[in-house]
Regions:
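N-terminal metal-binding scaffold of metallo-dependent hydrolase/deaminase domains
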Residues: 1-40
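A cross-family glycoside hydrolase active-site/sugar-binding cleft signature
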Residues: 22, 96-100, 126-128
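Histidine/acidic-residue-rich, glycine-tolerant segments that coordinate divalent metal ions
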Residues: 103-137
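Active-site metal-binding motif and surrounding structural segment of the metallo-beta-lactamase
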Residues: 39-55
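Metal-associated gating/positioning segment near the N- to mid-region
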Residues: 52-106
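Divalent metal-coordination and catalytic microenvironments
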Residues: 10, 24, 29, 51, ...
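Conserved beta-strand scaffold positions in the cores of enzyme catalytic domains, especially
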Residues: 6, 44-48, 124-126
């Protein structure tokens, strides 16, 4: 399978502009460049996105779960992995799994699970207080 892909025939949204007649060059999980369609290298497999939008991955800084998975209800590596995969399919490339105010024991379990999971998508944990502050316990 070719690891060099050119996403073309779509609208490309960059930080500053919207580009037509361009392609996004990708190798594995890295964006290499945005080039005019006429400059797509010969060793790239062209993927026609059929007029779709091409934009940077989205980031969600407070998410409790996705689909049937609620992280605080199932504090497991498997649950976190399912959340990762579901969010990636939806265009969310980074996120913060969130736990609502809870017991210290639940927070400690969540931290342990997060460390074991070694997620490449989750940026860290969002733990809601006020019980993180010793003076408020």
């Amino acid at each position: 399978m070719n690891q060099n892909l050119a996403l073309s025939n779509g609208r490309i949204f960059t930080e500053y502009q919207v580009l037509d007649n361009h392609a996004v060059l990708v190798n594995r999980d890295r964006i290499l460049a945005i080039v005019p369609v006429s400059e797509i290298p010969g060793d790239f497999e062209v993927i026609d996105v059929q007029g779709g939008n091409i934009c940077p991955g989205l980031i969600d800084l407070q998410i409790y779960g996705t689909g049937n998975d609620l992280f605080s209800a199932e504090l497991t590596v498997e649950s976190l992995s399912r959340i990762d995969n579901n969010l990636l399919k939806q265009g969310c490339t980074s996120y913060m799994p969130t736990l609502a105010t809870n017991t210290l024991a639940v927070f400690k379990t969540a931290i342990d699970v997060f460390r074991k999971a070694q997620s490449k998508v989750a940026l860290g944990l969002h733990l809601e207080g006020p019980f993180l502050n010793p003076a408020k316990r």
